[in-house]
């Protein structure tokens, strides 16, 4: 690698065995500039696809958000019924299809498992430090509002449509609470 600010031998940096660089990116986040073909030839790419199994993703979000909450001084994790709502919502919005098989408008935002962990963590911190209580549906809606709509304001409309057309029909208590908390979307 040439470093134009340095003169002589100091201006050239050569690779050595053992040197590694690891970078991550979401496949849907292309950024401003595409990588050049020359740069792509010098790199190895590994694609990690979304977790196909609900239970595996659920357990991962539960474990990782629990660790983060503990580190944040929150003595309890997110209740399983709220985690089920969160993970199901992320999966359905990510795939563009409900668990019942109904097609949804696709989101422009990447809704990764890491983002679900972040929402669970922020919901846990919010609920504990604002109310001293366990996470409820309002906390999940607040977290989703930021995560699902951060890149495109149109995604807020898609989230509202999901709540009105899909969540409204579900009869489990956690889903009813999630639907009733929809007015917390900004």
Q: Can you say where each PLM-predicted feature lies in the sequence?
A:
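Charge-rich, low-complexity amphipathic helices
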Residues: 43, 57-61, 65, 108, ...
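Residue-level signal for functionally critical sites in structured catalytic/ligand-binding pockets
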Residues: 29-32, 36-42, 110-114, 121, ...
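Conserved AAA+ ATPase small/helical "lid" subdomain
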Residues: 58-61, 65-139
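Canonical AAA+ ATPase core
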Residues: 1-72, 126
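A broadly tuned preference for mixed-charge, low-complexity surface segments
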Residues: 25-41, 45, 72-95, 99-109, ...
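Generic alpha-helix detector with strongest preference for long hydrophobic helices that associate
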Residues: 5, 16, 20, 24, ...
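C-terminal engagement/docking regions of AAA+ P-loop ATPases
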Residues: 128-186
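Helix N-cap and loop-to-helix transition residues
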Residues: 16, 36, 52-53, 79, ...
């Amino acid at each position: 690698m040439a470093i134009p600010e340095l003169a002589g031998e100091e201006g050239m940096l050569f690779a050595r065995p053992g040197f590694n660089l690891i970078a991550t990116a979401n496949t849907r986040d292309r950024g401003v500039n595409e990588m050049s073909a020359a740069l792509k030839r010098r790199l190895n790419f590994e694609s990690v696809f979304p977790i196909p199994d609900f239970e595996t993703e659920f357990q991962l979000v539960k474990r990782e958000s629990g660790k983060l909450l503990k580190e944040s001084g929150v003595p309890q994790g997110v209740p399983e019924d709220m985690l089920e709502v969160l993970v199901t919502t992320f999966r359905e919005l990510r795939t563009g299809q409900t668990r019942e098989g109904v097609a949804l408008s696709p989101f422009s935002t990447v809704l990764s498992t890491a983002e679900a962990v972040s929402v669970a963590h922020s919901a846990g911190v919010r609920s504990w430090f604002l109310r001293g209580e366990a996470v409820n549906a309002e906390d999940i809606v607040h977290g989703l509002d930021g995560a699902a709509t951060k890149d495109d304001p149109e995604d807020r409309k898609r989230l509202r449509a999901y709540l009105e057309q899909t969540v409204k029909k579900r009869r489990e208590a956690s889903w009813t609470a999630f639907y009733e908390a929809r007015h917390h979307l900004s």
